[in-house]
Structure formats: C-alpha cells, structure tokens
Amino acid sequence: MNRVFKKILPGTMLGLGIMFWGASAQAYKVFVSNEKDNTISVIDSDSFKVIKTVEVGQRPRGIILSKDKRYLYICASDDDHVEVMDTETYKIIDTLPSGPDPELFILHPDGVRLYIANEDDNMVTVVNVNTGQVLVEIPVGVEPEGMAVSPDGKTIVNTSETTNMAHFIDTETLEITDNVLVDSRPRFAEYTDDGKFIWVSSEVGGTVSVISNKTRKVVRKITFHVPGVRNEALQPVGVRVTHDLKTAFIALGPANRVAVVDTQTFEVKKYLLVGQRVWQLAFDAEEKYLYTSNGVSNDISVIDVEDLKVIKSIAVGRYPWGVAVK
C-alpha cells in the first residue's frame, strides 16, 4: 500500500461540490509556494481569491502535483527534504528524502519516481514516492535546478546553473547520455508534448535554447527585447508550451514580462506586463488561463491564453516562487 495513503482517513474524498465557469469548465485550485513566508497559498479558480494559507517547511520553492492530483509535493529547500500535502485536507502528511537544498523536481509519468534537483550537492536524487525510498543519486553538473521528463518517460533532462549545461539522463540506466552546452545559468527545462524538443531558459544569458531530443543539439536560440527595459533585466526562467505546440510562454524575471513566442517561427509575438520578478508559470487543465508567480510584488497574475491579456492580480504570501494547478 502507498505509504501516503496509510496516513489518510478512509472516505476523505472531494466534498466541495462542483462549480462551473459559464456552462462547462470545472472549478479547480491553484497552489502557490511562498518562499519567505514558509507557506502555500491555495486559490479558488471561481473567485480568484486565496481560500487557505498552509504552513509548510522552510523556504518552499518547487511544487508539483501527484499523478492523481491528490497530493502536492513541496521542495522545502532549507529543511533538505520534500513535503507531501493532502490537497483536500491541506495537511502535511509525509516527508520524502532529498539531498541538500532541493529546488525543483519532476515526477515520472509512472507517478512513482520523483527526480529531485539538489542545488548544494550537484546530485539528482530519485525517490519512490510510495515507499519513501531513495532509489539512486545521479551526479550532474554544478548547481542543478531545472528538471524535465520526456512524454514517454525514457529521458530526464536536468539543467546545471554553473556548468551551463542540459544533462540528458536515461531513466533505465540512470546515466547521463548527453551534455548540451547552453547559455549562462540555465534555470528551467520543458519538453514539448510531442517529445521532439526541450526548451531551456538561461537566466543570465538572456536566451531560451530549443534542443532537439533526437540530435541533442541546439536548433534555435530565442532572444528578447522590450523597449525601455535594460537587456540585463531580461532573465528568462519559467517556460510553458501549449498542448497544440503552437505557443510558448516564457517568464522574464525582473523584466516583469511574459514573452509569448510562436513555436513555428520562434519569434516573440507579444510581451505581457505582469507582476514584479515573474518566475514560474502554470496552465489550468484546459489551457484557458496561465498563472504566473511574481516574487517581488507578492502576487499571482492570471493571463487569458486566447486573448493574451492579463485579467487579474491575486495577492498571496511573500516571495511567491512555484505555482501548480489542480
């Protein structure tokens, strides 16, 4: 039996009822990690308001949902472990081991293997979320952060900030098969849904590299220019690509913008003004809205994906870092 389920009372199923956007879309929750407050903010999608603030471990950063959306995994970076929160009761029900200073992670499509980037020991820790067992630690570059998994589950990509590389890891052999050099301080990696490309953001380099999964070579490099904004403020971090593979959204950090990129031409179509130091991004299930965590203005921006407009700002805790949508 899953070790997490042992700690849950039987019959604790969703009891909030079903609410709708207009005539179709089902209501959901948005989870935000607040790095300075040591909390998770829970936002209701109907009201766009915070309905719960949950105290968690020290310096929560990366967050990700379990495959069934029942649990939220939280990188408690200064506690050197991963916490598990029940998304219905909002209680921390378990902790999982990691290395020192876990920052980001990715869950394998099997829903069992969690790959954790530990910034302080240059390792990726692989944990079985059902047993809490460390399966292996994989040496990577210096200051690992970004994590992505191919749709077929065969490859993990880790980015190392100081080594300036994307490391391709075979999930069967658990060995690095390829190292791809990118620009300075790669912070995030995102596979496209067809598994053909990986988008890697380089914060200090100011670029996003598009890497072919087949050749393991950079095939395009995207740069940014916002009138009136200093080039050194254009610091790409979070990246999300739509399921139809037509559009990419890129958080530009202290530029306070999200770049909208045509994935066919690799040209920037638009810059959307959001909160201060925009960091991570998350779509809702239907990709109607994109949520951005804005670390310095302490809020979340809501972007209408079809209209490419910012429609709402939601105040959360101090230094919001990660965002995930149930």
Show which residues each predicted segment covers.
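Bacterial N-terminal signal peptides that target proteins for export
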Residues: 2-12
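Predominantly soluble domains enriched in secretory-pathway, periplasmic, or organellar proteins
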Residues: 15-18, 23-326
